[in-house]
Amino acid sequence: MATAAAAGAGQEKQLAPTLLSFFIYNPKLGPKEGEEEKKILFYHPNEVEKNEKIRNVGLCEAIVQFTRTFSPTKPAKSLHTQKNRQFFHEPEENFWMVMVVRNPIIEKHKDGKPVYEYQEEELLDKVYSSVLQQCYSMYKLFNGTFLKAMEDGGVKVLKERLEKFFHRYLQTLHLQSCDLLDVFCGISFFPLDKMTYLKIQSFINRMEESLNIVKYTAFLYNDQLIWSGLEQDDMRILYKYLTTSLFPRHMEPELAGRDSPIRAEMPGNLQHYGRFLTGPLNLNDPEAKCRFPKIFVNTDDTYEELHLIVYKAMSAAVCFMIDASIPPTLEFCRKLDSIVGPQLTVLASDICEQYNINKRISGAEKEPQFKFIYFNHMNLAEKSTIHMRKTPSVSLASVHPDLMKILGDINSDFSRVDEDEEIIVKAMSDYWVVGKKSDQRELYVILNQKNANLIEVNEEVKKLCATQFNNIFFLD
């Protein structure tokens, strides 16, 4: 939905970018004249008249064909028009996804009538292309590939799966909140000392031994990843689902430290705080349903279908993934609860205490003069002091949108070349913005020092690298 913000006395309104349409088609499904509708596998909004759907899909086909003559392997990525921008993605051969986003608008009043000015240069291709790619990755995580659906039951099954998934998922796309973090789609890692990390490793080994049907495990604390047995690309999209969808739905007042009283009303009156975030709500109910969401991983080679069991105690969450051919019983869920619950409760307390001790040792940080985003392409590690909270519905970036756009522009420049480089920009608002790319790592810094010169800005960034990333090599 468009958010309108009145801008002062001029009665200007700023209308955010919005999703105009989203569709998926396969040109091979309706090659003959009169069969064009067969190509369309999904179209949002559905109430659009049939001929308009066919016309829009036909136009996209023509654009793809035209651009293929210049770039056979990488045809159309995006199309810019005055009012909107179209993004194209071919995740599987001949399956095309298209997302049409309306450009932001400034609404002014002239002679008592509204006048609309489209902001054609505001949207960043890289950001919204990444959002479109994530739409596919999220679909694939819960449904497998488009081809798999075709093999399971032809076009009919694929259409049903697309409708069921995207009808809900598109409602969670808040395009006005998208920024550089959507390009990275990285993972925030929880900082840990070696001793506590070994405790967690030992806990995972014990759990996998006790619950021998567990194939993969992932461990998170405070919505940050500590350990994962999954492939990186599968974990990055599962992490996005957990932190932006599942965990926010189960928010509760978190308990700190081991001194908190144990809740006596826990299922089975066990002395722990463990509970299932997916699966049975009440283990004492003999009728309780043990249904877990299914996920698909390693779709490029072994193609594994798994049940996703997410279990949480205080701020610690564990994902157990078991083969989908083994249906989890209520008995198994009770066993998991009795084994994992008490140990995870103690472990969560230990992590919390250790984290607080480390925080005290490092001392209270005063508000620094800079904010930064860091991303490592090798392990997908992401760190941002710019975002206070990043969920699908809200991106509380603590800097002005103009600065976020500069960060995106620098990132686009970086992606065009393979060499390491550094870019320094002075914004109109007198902020300095620095981008550093070195050895598969990227660092973006925003400095609030309007009287500084280039040399001083460079020194500040060097200091930041020394304090925040002392074990990371950045080229000077």
From Swiss-Prot:
Q: GO cellular component annotations, sorted alphabetically?
A: intracellular membrane-bounded organelle; lysosomal membrane; Mon1-Ccz1 complex
In which compartments does the protein localize? Answer: Lysosome membrane
Report what the protein is called. Answer: Vacuolar fusion protein CCZ1 homolog
The organism of origin for this protein: Gallus gallus
Instruction: List, alphabetically, the InterPro entries matched.
Output: Ccz1, CCZ1/INTU/HSP4_longin_1, CCZ1/INTU/HSP4_longin_3, CCZ1/INTU_longin_2
Q: Tell me, which GO biological process terms does this entry list?
A: vesicle-mediated transport
Q: Which family does it belong to?
A: Belongs to the CCZ1 family.
Asked if the record carries the keyword Membrane, the reply is yes
Top-rank taxon? Eukaryota
**Known Pfam families for this protein?**
Intu_longin_1, Intu_longin_2, Intu_longin_3
Membrane-spanning residues = none
Write the record's keywords in alphabetical order, separated by commas: Lysosome, Membrane
**Is Transferase given among the entry's keywords?**
no
